[in-house]
């Protein structure tokens, strides 16, 4: 399910860079339905497993998995939003031309997604800790700065559609990054701290 969400995000970003055929974009949007289907299946399997085993020791693992599934599904939703941008934005969504900071956020989130998948599959605590460090500076603060500067009038674009596309894309990337952070915390945090900053780790 995480691989499917990752694949959808990568393709959504790639397709937004070129004026792709409308049918291709809509077909890719439908991948979100697959993610939603997997989410429902995982929930059913979790409930069935717990009902049959009735093992209290499994509760922690079950809650971790449930949290992770929700974050993965949300990433699929935001990837679908990126595809909507590609469909309705009249130009190619070239982040290098729109704003260098937006391009940097895009690259950071893409890299973090690759590494998050790896950290989850290998249960790599060191990699997970590394990913959590610098998240606020490289994603959250950078995204907020772009959005706030546009709203305040400090940052201007040639057209309203450019401004809107930049704001939306910055926000989508920020939210995807946040859900990736939540997923990463499942590797190192106890169940009550999933999605939150660990002590000693500066985000």
Model-derived regions: residue spans:
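Cytosolic, long alpha-helical scaffolding segments
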Residues: 1-203
